[in-house]
Amino acid sequence: MLFPSIVAALAALANPVLSLTIPQATGSELDVQLSAIGNTRIKAVITNKADRQLKLLKYNNFFDDGPIQKAGVFKDGQPVKFEGMLRRVLMKNLEPSLFVSLSPGQTVEREFDIASTADLASGGAYSVFSQGAIPFAEGDGTTIAGAVAFKSNKLDLDIDGALAATVSKAINPISARTRVESACRGEQRETLLKALEYSAQLSRAAAQAAQNNTRKVEEYFMKSDAQTVETIVARLNAVAQESSSTDSGATRYFCNDRGNQCTPNTIAYTLPSLNVVVNCPIYYDLPVISDECHAQDQATTCLHEFTHNPGVYDPYCRDHAYGYDGIRKLSPEQALLNADTYSLFANGKPKSQTTSNFNLKF
């Protein structure tokens, strides 16, 4: 993992939703129907099927105004490479403006263009599908009370590749002429180094726990067979390795926002297509490591973000769900590729704040 001295100006981005096979849609309190309204432009019709109001968090789903991936795109049964942003959201002290309320039976529509975050220039047959769990609050409050799962229909498309290639991309290529001096200095640098130290420690401990406690693996990942455990251990060990070096590795880490994506309650974000991690200002307000079960802190944020980077471990993790209640609604396939599942598993019980001496070089 590198602290670069130069970085390109980062433009608008996006956020993965799905991977692997496409399951059939089933009943849910939230109905999502996808339809095509252009070559690569999609309309999502979201209906509250519950008998109560749903007060949904806007981030990382169809209601997000940011350039995140609203649906997975597939060609020949395989996910198309995603080029966009994944953000980690602080799940407390949420502003009312970060929620959208749907009354029972209410329907809203959202539109997005899948070509802005995927290369569809080859054209031909594609499938689009979305699935996940959206956090919600209750009444007039903004405290997350749970998560509502959803599965959309599978939308088949015949895409004109030449037309798709004309859609503006959400992320611009790196320009060697656009340089920003390193901002990882002083107190921010020391804070991040300490968080990386704990990230390495937590990741290694979690990898060992996965091998020794299949009951806990089942609780968080919905499955505990040998292949599942092997994947979990390999990913966590890869995160530990990436956390243990600041002058080499697969990722670049920025202490300050360079893409103007640090919206309210965004702790950090990752650009998986570039293997870049960026901290937002509120990252530095969090404790380096927390003794509270499932709490968000700097160390688990580093762990969380590194699981998003294909250079660390591929296939990289998405943001299918947030929080313990949310991850418990995922399928085993989704859980294995969900970033918050790993960070929650790693701090699923209070941690000692003793620090081992990692050889962190800068």
UniProtKB/Swiss-Prot annotation:
Main location: secreted
Named cofactor requirement(s): Zn(2+)
Name of the encoding gene: MEP2
BP-aspect Gene Ontology terms: proteolysis
Function comment: Secreted metalloproteinase that allows assimilation of proteinaceous substrates. Shows high activities on basic nuclear substrates such as histone and protamine. May be involved in virulence.
Keywords, alphabetical: Cleavage on pair of basic residues, Disulfide bond, Hydrolase, Metal-binding, Metalloprotease, Protease, Secreted, Signal, Virulence, Zinc, Zymogen
GO molecular function: metal ion binding; metalloendopeptidase activity
Subcellular location: Secreted
Upper taxonomic lineage: Eukaryota, Fungi, Dikarya, Ascomycota, Pezizomycotina
Catalysed reactions, semicolon-separated: Preferential cleavage of bonds with hydrophobic residues in P1'. Also 3-Asn-|-Gln-4 and 8-Gly-|-Ser-9 bonds in insulin B chain
One GO cellular component term noted in the UniProt record for this chain: extracellular region
Residues given in the record as Zn(2+) binding sites: 304, 308, 319
Origin species: Coccidioides posadasii (strain C735) (Valley fever fungus)
Protein name: Neutral protease 2 homolog MEP2
Catalytic residues of the enzyme: 305
